[in-house]
Design a protein with these regions (language model features):
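Structured soluble/peripheral alpha/beta segments that form catalytic or ligand/cofactor-binding pockets
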Residues: 1-377
């Protein structure tokens, strides 16, 4: 029960972590696009199989949603779920999807229970190989400057996975020596939450003439002696007539908390012109201390979860945070995600599983490279 302008009281309100003058049921503003979200993946180092998952909490929409699924070659199985937040306000579990914080900022557990929608399930423990790292604030406005299209904080972590994945009745044991994981957690204002508002003035940046190259890429590296380190880069460049935006960040991350920061990234990437899938290439990096480093990358296989099935950039008219009733569970199977027809439904945004060579250390890295490109040269 609420009292005046104060939100409902939750068990979390017993803790000493309040930062606004309200209960934990309430966020600092009433924007309907305010979102708290986790997104992650785990993949076999040989590219034979990967899983993707995500959970979203939309306090101002009274909704929790999530997805989980598997990618094997060009095949993909996806399960989605959505529910009313008020039915269990202190949990982001939804339908057959479960999320557990085992050790804060270190280890989480994510579960997709056996379900009636698709023959896919998993139970995975994801453990960081380096501490969680805060990225720079995601801060973007419309071209006029009157509204934030993004204003959010995000941290990421890279490491290993253990547990099991089951697809079509066949169980695969997941071991930390042969699987990697990456995950992120964000909160704030983000684009593409709910259906587009029809009576807003069109934003020129969203026009068809926009040129885009986006790369978000965490990696887990292992040296020949068995020691490990992590890496993350985020490159975003887009422009349209009269407007240009270029941003980059990232660095190498170590178990003791040290970071070696990047000040410039030059991606030299190759894409399949039929479906815009990343094939490989190089990342030329300039470090904060002036050194130059080169990472050579190759797509290990066709495996890589299409995030459009999790409603990133929408899927067949559906978007994150939309009301679908007190509980809704659905999903689908794609026999071949690489065809132009499938990409038209799913969009090109995916967790391409890549293997990377660090020319400075001789280490080999594995991870997911999320890319979005407007045109392939």
């Amino acid at each position: 029960m609420t009292h005046g302008s104060i939100g409902p009281l939750l068990a979390a309100d017993e803790s000493f972590n309040h930062q606004i003058v309200d209960t934990f049921a309430t966020v600092s503003q009433s924007d309907y696009s305010w979102t708290e979200k986790v997104c992650g993946m785990a993949a076999a180092r040989d590219g034979s199989l990967s899983i993707g998952f995500g959970f979203g909490k939309y306090a101002n929409r009274n909704i929790v949603d999530g997805y989980g699924g598997a990618s094997r070659g060009v095949q993909q199985w996806t399960v989605r779920a959505s529910r009313e937040l008020a039915s269990a306000p202190e949990s982001i579990d939804v339908g057959p999807l479960r999320y557990e914080i085992v050790e804060p900022l270190k280890t989480i557990r994510v579960i997709l229970e056996p379900n009636h929608v698709q023959p896919v399930a998993f139970d995975l423990l994801l453990e960081g190989g380096a501490p969680c790292v805060l990225e720079e604030r995601e801060d973007r406005r419309t071209l006029t400057g009157y509204r934030h299209t993004a204003n959010q904080v995000r941290y990421h972590q890279t490491g290993t996975a253990s547990g099991w994945v089951e697809v079509q009745g066949k169980r695969v044991e997941v071991r930390p020596e042969s699987w990697v994981m990456t995950r992120d957690h964000s909160w704030g204002i983000r684009p593409d939450v709910g259906l587009p508002i029809p009576d807003l003035v069109p934003d020129p940046v969203d026009g068809s003439g926009q040129k885009v190259l986006a790369v978000w890429n965490p990696l887990f590296f292992q040296l020949p002696d068995g020691s490990t380190y992590a890496f993350h880069q985020y490159f975003l460049e887009y422009s349209s007539p009269g407007f240009a935006h270029r941003r980059m960040q990232g660095g190498f991350e170590y178990a003791d908390g040290r970071r070696e920061l990047i000040v410039a990234i030059e991606p030299r990437l190759r894409f399949n012109p039929l479906n815009k899938r990343l094939l490989g290439g190089e990342f030329h990096l300039r470090m904060a201390d002036g050194r130059e480093r080169v990472l050579s990358a190759e797509a290990i296989s066709d495996t890589g979860f299409h995030l459009g099935a999790g409603l990133y950039h929408g899927f067949e008219g559906r978007h994150h945070g939309s009301w679908r009733g007190r509980l809704d569970v659905d999903g689908e199977y794609f026999a071949d995600c690489s065809t132009p027809e499938s990409v038209a439904r799913l969009n090109q945004f995916r967790d391409c599983i890549i293997r990377v060579h660090d020319h400075s250390t001789g280490a080999t890295g594995w991870g997911n490279c999320q890319t979005y490109v407007s045109a392939v040269p």
